[in-house]
């Protein structure tokens, strides 16, 4: 750690600001990896003129890149062509913890938030790789063969993670 409060998340090789609540900060690479690999939903934060726009997506993760399946057109694609800098949030566990005291309720969770740049690679080999990762993540255990016209109708977005922080609450 440097004196500025930064640390390097070594596996991702990302420089990340320390959190205010260090007792809730996740710095363990294995925990961050678990969140990235096991969660089902990634929420993408995009900019729509001067407003925030958030969209939940299915995804897969490999080597600092989040792969996202998408149609060629739609609001998400329109906004990304205007500004390909995005933020994202992924949570793995969440649970409401009740209390007999109204303000004593809390939540137990693990999450990561980050920023990155989205690119589109329309090369059929790149599309197949991204789609294979997504299909395997969600349980496909058969041989994956895609029809050319199916690949032509879809897009694989690649979100290159540039910064990430992890936060948890509750006893893990």
What is the meaning of each model-derived region?
Residues 39-72:
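Short beta-strand segments
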